[in-house]
C-alpha cells in the first residue's frame, strides 16, 4: 500500500503484543522505518528485532510515566528525523469482572494505565505530529458498540480515549494531524491467548457459543486484519479520514 511514508518513523506503542507486533511487521514490510516500545517484555522485543534482521528498533516505555514519555518521544523524534505515525496498541491482561466485583485499587490502576497513559502520549506527541502532518491510530474495543458484561475495565477507559481521539481530530485537523481508532472484536492473538490460560476465566464453551452467535462472520479475527486496517488509516489512502472508529470485529457490533 502506497503511503508515501514521509521522513521519520512509525512508532508502535506496545509492539510486543499480538496486535502490536503484527503492526510492527506490517509497517516494516511496507517500507516504513519502525520504532516500537515495550513495557516489560524485553525478551519478546529482542525476538522481534532479530526476526526483522535488526531493521526495526525497540525501546522500553511506561506510558503512565509522563516524564519518560516526554523524553522518549523527543529522542525518537530527533533520532529519526520525525515521527509520521503513532499506533497505540498498548494493553495488558485486564481482569474480566463485573462492576460489583472490582476494587478501587484495580480501577485506579487501569485508569492510570489506559486513560492517563494515553493522555501522556497524546499531549506530548501532537506537536511532533503537526511537524510531520502525521497520523495517530488507537487500538480500541468493539465493546464500545455492544457492551459485553464483565468487560468494564477494558471498555470504560477506551470510551474516554475515544472522545480524546475525536477531540484531537477536531482540534488538530487544521494542523494536518489525523486521529482514528480501530475497535477490535475477539482477535486470536496476544491478550486473548493469555486470558484463555488464566484460571476462573470467562472464556468457557458457553462464552464461545454466545460470541459466535453475535458474529456476522463466524470466526475470530487475525492480528494481521487489524494491522492492515492500521496501515490503511496511516496511509495516504485515508488522507480524508479522521475522527473515525472502524470496527474490525466480524460484525459483532451489528
Feature map (PLM): residue ranges:
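Substrate-binding pocket helix/loop in short-chain dehydrogenase/reductase
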Residues: 97-99, 103-111, 207, 211
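Catalytic loop of short-chain dehydrogenase/reductase
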Residues: 92-93, 135-174, 186-187
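Conserved NAD(P)H cofactor-binding loop of Rossmann-fold oxidoreductase domains
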Residues: 89-96, 250-251
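Short, small/polar-rich loop/turn modules that mediate ligand/substrate recognition or access, typified
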Residues: 173, 178, 241-243
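C-terminal substrate-recognition "lid" of short-chain dehydrogenase/reductases
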Residues: 128, 219-248, 253
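Conserved glycine-rich cofactor-binding loop
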Residues: 9, 16-17
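Conserved glycine-rich Rossmann-like NAD(P)H-binding loop of the short-chain dehydrogenase/reductase
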Residues: 30-45
